[in-house]
């Protein structure tokens, strides 16, 4: 593919959805674009505000915690895998509404609790819920706080 065609395709892609530079570099590499041309294309996209890692990180954080029900740890891992700078990640994470975040964690844990067999002991349920919530990326301190709340155990029976 010619670099001119690649620019047009990436501009179209970036106009439709947020992208990060590492994803675009991977696409360019897959299309057989040379490293030097890739760098020029990425610079063009940044200069013309088609791509912005700050904007991408904020959208990623917002989507993953609100719509996918992910915790901070899983979001951080996802952004690191996209090679987003730590400072950008921290800034994006600071926009999380802590009340909403705790509510999302509570709902995820309560939903999982309702799926667990009744014959399991409370300790076994606790262990499974900790593993579940940790795999979703929620912090252990938040998980324990939710598991220690009477509201969780009473809401699962209704």
PLM-predicted stretches and their roles:
Residues 1-158:
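An alpha-helical, amphipathic repeat domain used for nucleic-acid recognition
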């Amino acid at each position: 593919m010619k670099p001119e065609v690649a620019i047009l395709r990436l501009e179209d892609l970036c106009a439709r959805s947020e992208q990060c530079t590492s994803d675009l570099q991977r696409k360019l590499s897959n299309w057989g674009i040379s490293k030097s041309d890739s760098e020029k294309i990425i610079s063009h996209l940044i200069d013309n505000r088609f791509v912005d890692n700050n904007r991408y990180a904020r959208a990623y954080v917002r989507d993953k915690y609100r719509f996918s029900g992910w915790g901070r740890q899983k979001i951080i891992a996802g952004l690191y895998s996209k090679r987003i700078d730590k400072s950008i990640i921290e800034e994006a994470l600071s926009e999380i509404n802590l009340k909403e975040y705790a509510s999302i964690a509570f709902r995820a844990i309560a939903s999982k609790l309702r799926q667990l067999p009744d014959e399991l002991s409370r300790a076994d349920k606790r262990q499974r819920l900790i593993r579940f919530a940790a795999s979703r990326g929620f912090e252990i301190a938040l998980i324990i706080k939710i598991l220690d709340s009477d509201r969780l155990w009473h809401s699962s029976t209704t």
